[in-house]
C-alpha cells in the first residue's frame, strides 16, 4: 500500500495517518448490526440447517453498522395505523414550539395476531427528487415504453402535486413492466411503470438480465462504466446469491454464473484500486474490512485504503472511517470524520451524525449539547441525498415523520415540534425500498396490503414488496407472503405449497407468529405431533394463542395420529376463513412484541424446497458465510 499511503496528506480533507493495535482490529471485526433472531436446527440435515443459519444470521444483518433493532419496523405487519394523508411542511421547516406532553405520542394501534391479519388480508378490496442520486451515472435512460403514460425514471420521484394526479393501477396492470434492453446504465436509471407516484423496486429477474446483457462492460475502456457494472454486480450478489445458495441450491447454473461475475467484479475493482481510483479504493477497502468473498480480513489495510480514497475526494470513505472509530469506542474522533463528510454533503455522514445528536450521544460534546434541532436538519439532508450504498437516512426520516423512531431524546423539553406527516413518510419509505432497504420494503408491503397512508389496497404490489424483503431476510415478510398464498386474492392464486414454504422459513428463523401458523396448519390436518411441536415453539416466546391451543390439545381425547402431511395437503382457503377469534385480537393496544426464539428439533416431516443438495466447492458453507459478511449495499 505504499502508493496509497503516499496520497494521505494531499487533500484538504486532511485524513490523518492512523494505526490500529491488534486488540483494536479484533474489536472492529465485531461491527454492530441488527440482532436478528437466532435460528435453530429443526431440519435434520446439518448442512441445510447451517446454510439457513448463515443466511438469516449473516446476510440479513443490517447493511449499515449501528442500525439497531430500534430502527427496525416500529410495529408488526398488522400494526399499521390507519392514517389520513397529511400535507404538512417538510421536517426541517416544521420545527416549532409545542407543549412537551404532546410530542411523540404513540399512535393508537390494535393488536396484530396472525389470525387477525389473515382475515384482514382476505377481506381487503382493491378500490422529483431535487438532484440525481450520487454515485450513479446520470445518463439519460434509453428504455422505451409501449404506452402513453408519462414515464418516471427510477431515482426520481414526482412532487406532491404531480402525485395527486396519478391514477392508481387497475388489476390488469403489471408491476414488472420493465425493459431489460441494455443501455449502459444500471437498472436504477431505467424507466419504470408510471401508474404509481413512485417507482417499484427493480425485480431480481430484471437485475440479473441487466448483468447478463452488460457483462462485457467489465472490459470497457471507460473506467466509470466498468466500475459501475462491478459495483452493481457486488450489490446484487450480496442479496441474491445467499438466497440462491440457501433455498435454491439446485440452481447451480445461476449460482456458478453469479460467482463468476462476482470474481470478475472484484478483479476489476482491485485493478482500478491499484490505479488509485478513489471509488474503487472504497470498495476494495470494504472487502478487506468485512473479509468478504474469501478475502482475509485486514482492518489496517482497509483503513489505509479508506484514508487514501477520502484524500482523493471520495467522501463516503469518511463515513466508513468514522464507523471504524466509533465501533472502537473513539466517538469524538469519529464525529470529526462525520463532520467532514457533512461538510461535503455526504448522505451517510449526515444520517449517522443526526442519529448521534437525536439519541443524545453527543449531549456532552460542546456545541451539540441541547441542539437537537440540528439533528432533524441533518436527517432531512440525508434523506434528500440518499443512495443505494446507504439508504438508511430515508428510513429513519420516515419513522421520525410518523413519530415511530424509538430511542430519541425528549425533543419536547426543548419545545421542538415535529408534526406527523404521513405523505412525507410514505415517500421516504418508497424511496428507501427502491434503493434496497429491506425494512422499508417490508413496510411498503404492509402499506399496499392494508391501504395505508392514502394508498389503495393492491395485493400484487403488496406481495411484490414482501417478496423482495423476504429475499433480504425479513422473516416478517416471509410470514406475510405465506398469508397471501394461503388466501389468494385478485391476481394472486392460492398456492398452499408456497405458503407452507414461506411459513416454514419464518418459523425456522424463530418468528413466533409463523410458528403458531405452522402449528395451526398441522392442527387443522389432524397432525397432533407436529402441531404440538410448533405450538410449543411459539409458546416459548410467550405467544398467547399458542398457549391456549396447547391447552386445548391436552384436553382432547387421544386419537390415532394421522400420517404427516405433505406439501400437497395443506389446509385450503375455507379452513383459514373459519379461524376463530383469539385472545390477542381482543387484547389491549400496545401489547409488547413477541420475542423470537430459536428452533431446536422438530418431528420428522416431508421436506420442502430446503433440501440437501450437493454443491460445488466454491458454494460451500465457508464461502457462503464469508460472502454474507459483505455489506456493500
From Swiss-Prot:
It is found in: Cytoplasm. The keyword Phosphoprotein applies. Residues 136-149 have a biased composition (Polar residues). GO terms for cellular component: 1,3-beta-D-glucan synthase complex; cell cortex of cell tip; cell division site; cell tip; cytosol; division septum; nucleus. Residues 121-151, 583-613 are annotated as: Disordered. Keywords: Cell cycle, Cell division, Cytoplasm, Phosphoprotein, Repeat, Septation. One of its GO terms (biological process) is fungal-type cell wall beta-glucan biosynthetic process. The modification Phosphoserine is found at residue 148. It comes from the Eukaryota. Residues 592-613 have a biased composition (Low complexity). Gene3D superfamilies: Tetratricopeptide repeat domain. Sel1-like repeats lie at residues 278-314, 315-346, 438-474, 475-511, 512-543. Involved in septum formation. Required for the proper localization of chs2 at the septum. This is Chitin synthase regulatory factor 4. The gene is chr4.
Amino acid at each position: 500500500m505504499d502508493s496509497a499511503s503516499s496520497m494521505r496528506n494531499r487533500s484538504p480533507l486532511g485524513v490523518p495517518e492512523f494505526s490500529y493495535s491488534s486488540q483494536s482490529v479484533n474489536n472492529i471485526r465485531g461491527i454492530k448490526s441488527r440482532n436478528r433472531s437466532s435460528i435453530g436446527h429443526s431440519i435434520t440435515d446439518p448442512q441445510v440447517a447451517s446454510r439457513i443459519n448463515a443466511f438469516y444470521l449473516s446476510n440479513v444483518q443490517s447493511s449499515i453498522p449501528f442500525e439497531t433493532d430500534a430502527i427496525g419496523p416500529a410495529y408488526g405487519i398488522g400494526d399499521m395505523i390507519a392514517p389520513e394523508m397529511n400535507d404538512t411542511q417538510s421536517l426541517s421547516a416544521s420545527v416549532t414550539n409545542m407543549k412537551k406532553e404532546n410530542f411523540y405520542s404513540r399512535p393508537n394501534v390494535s393488536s396484530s395476531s396472525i389470525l387477525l391479519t389473515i382475515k384482514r388480508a382476505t377481506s381487503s378490496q382493491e378500490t422529483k427528487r431535487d438532484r440525481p442520486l450520487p454515485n450513479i451515472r446520470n445518463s439519460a435512460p434509453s428504455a422505451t415504453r409501449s404506452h402513453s403514460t408519462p414515464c418516471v425514471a427510477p431515482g426520481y420521484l414526482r412532487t406532491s402535486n404531480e402525485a395527486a394526479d396519478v391514477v392508481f393501477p387497475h388489476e390488469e396492470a403489471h408491476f414488472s413492466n420493465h425493459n431489460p434492453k441494455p443501455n449502459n446504465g444500471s437498472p436504477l436509471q431505467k424507466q419504470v411503470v408510471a401508474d404509481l407516484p413512485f417507482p417499484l423496486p427493480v425485480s431480481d429477474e430484471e437485475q440479473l438480465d441487466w448483468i447478463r446483457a452488460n457483462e462485457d462492460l467489465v472490459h470497457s475502456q471507460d473506467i466509470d462504466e466498468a466500475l459501475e457494472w462491478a459495483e452493481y454486480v457486488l450489490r446484487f450478489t450480496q442479496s441474491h446469491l445467499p438466497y440462491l445458495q440457501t433455498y435454491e441450491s439446485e440452481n447451480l447454473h445461476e449460482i456458478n454464473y453469479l460467482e463468476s461475475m462476482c470474481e470478475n467484479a472484484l478483479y476489476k475493482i482491485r485493478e482500478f484500486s491499484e490505479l488509485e481510483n478513489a471509488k474503487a479504493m472504497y470498495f476494495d477497502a470494504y472487502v478487506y474490512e468485512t473479509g468478504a468473498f474469501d478475502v482475509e480480513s485486514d482492518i489496517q489495510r482497509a483503513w489505509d485504503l479508506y484514508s487514501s480514497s477520502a484524500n482523493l475526494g471520495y467522501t463516503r470513505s469518511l463515513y466508513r472511517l468514522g464507523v471504524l472509530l466509533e465501533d472502537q469506542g473513539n466517538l469524538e474522533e469519529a464525529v470529526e470524520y462525520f463532520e467532514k463528510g457533512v461538510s461535503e454533503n455526504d448522505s451517510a455522514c449526515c444520517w449517522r451524525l443526526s442519529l448521534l445528536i437525536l439519541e443524545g450521544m453527543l449531549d456532552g460534546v460542546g456545541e451539540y449539547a441541547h441542539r437537537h434541532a440540528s439533528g432533524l436538519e441533518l436527517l432531512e439532508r440525508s434523506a434528500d441525498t440518499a443512495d443505494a450504498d446507504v439508504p438508511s437516512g430515508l428510513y429513519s426520516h420516515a419513522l421520525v415523520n410518523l413519530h415511530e423512531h424509538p430511542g430519541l431524546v425528549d425533543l419536547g423539553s426543548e419545545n421542538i415540534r415535529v408534526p406527523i406527516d404521513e405523505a412525507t413518510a410514505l415517500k421516504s419509505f418508497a424511496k428507501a425500498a427502491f434503493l434496497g432497504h429491506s425494512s422499508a420494503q417490508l413496510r411498503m408491503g404492509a402499506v399496499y396490503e392494508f391501504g395505508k397512508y392514502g394508498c389503495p389496497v393492491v395485493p400484487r404490489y403488496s406481495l411484490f414488496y414482501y417478496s423482495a424483503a423476504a429475499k433480504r431476510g425479513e422473516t416478517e415478510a416471509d410470514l406475510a407472503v405465506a398469508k397471501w398464498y394461503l388466501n389468494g386474492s385478485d391476481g394472486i392464486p392460492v398456492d398452499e405449497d408456497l405458503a407452507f414454504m414461506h411459513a416454514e422459513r419464518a418459523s425456522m428463523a424463530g418468528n413466533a407468529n409463523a410458528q403458531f401458523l405452522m402449528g395451526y396448519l398441522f392442527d387443522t390436518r389432524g397432525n397432533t405431533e407436529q402441531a404440538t411441536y410448533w405450538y410449543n415453539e411459539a409458546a416459548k416466546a410467550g405467544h398467547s394463542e399458542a398457549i391456549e391451543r396447547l391447552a386445548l390439545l391436552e384436553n382432547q381425547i387421544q386419537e390415532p395420529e394421522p400420517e404427516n402431511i405433505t406439501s400437497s395437503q395443506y389446509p385450503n382457503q375455507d379452513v383459514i376463513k373459519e379461524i376463530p377469534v383469539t385472545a390477542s385480537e381482543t387484547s389491549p393496544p400496545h401489547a409488547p412484541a413477541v420475542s423470537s426464539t430459536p428452533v431446536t428439533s422438530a418431528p420428522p416431516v416431508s421436506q420442502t424446497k430446503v433440501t440437501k443438495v450437493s454443491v460445488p466447492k466454491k458454494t460451500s458453507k465457508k464461502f457462503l458465510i464469508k460472502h454474507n459478511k459483505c455489506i456493500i449495499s
